[in-house]
């Protein structure tokens, strides 16, 4: 794919949409393994230094990823929802995580390459481009996973290797 820049020069694509989704899904698979590594009670209650429990961070990630990609693909805005019924069961969170992964995959293929440069207001609140929104989704997940690594280590649990995506 070639893009013509404003000054008339051509730019070649650095990463394809397929490469980007594969990269993100590698991160999501790693985050799933981090969720699995937590003892049930600690997943919902363990905190350090005023940070939220990892379960709350995962609720945020669930509220952003699947619904965000769906909004980008369909153009239909929905309010940001970071609260999901889980009954304090890690198995339910993992089920929701897998559903979100499927939702991302379903809607990702509907995003046309030219859409990545479009300006949007995701969830009716956050302005940027499609690609900057997706980068935020990924960066936010990495950020919260890093917090979870600190939690796991404080519990005496070796987290999954960060590079095994």
What positions do the PLM features span?
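Short, contiguous alpha-helical
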Residues: 2-7, 21-25, 29-35, 40-83, ...
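Acidic catalytic patch
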Residues: 109-124
């Amino acid at each position: 794919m070639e893009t013509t820049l404003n000054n008339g020069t051509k730019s070649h694509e650095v990463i394809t949409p397929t490469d980007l989704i594969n990269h993100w899904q590698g991160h999501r698979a790693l985050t799933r393994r981090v969720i699995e590594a937590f003892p049930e009670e600690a997943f919902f209650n363990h905190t350090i230094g005023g940070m939220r429990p990892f379960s709350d961070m995962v609720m945020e990630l669930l509220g952003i990823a699947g619904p965000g990609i769906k909004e980008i693909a369909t153009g239909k805005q929905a309010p940001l929802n970071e609260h999901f019924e889980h009954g304090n069961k890690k198995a339910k969170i993992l089920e929701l995580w897998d559903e979100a992964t499927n939702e991302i995959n379903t809607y990702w293929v509907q995003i046309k390459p030219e859409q990545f440069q479009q300006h949007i207001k995701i969830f009716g609140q956050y302005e940027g481009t499609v690609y900057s929104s997706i980068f935020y989704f990924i960066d936010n997940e990495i950020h919260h996973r890093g917090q979870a690594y600190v939690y796991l280590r404080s519990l005496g649990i070796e987290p999954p290797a960060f590079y095994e995506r």
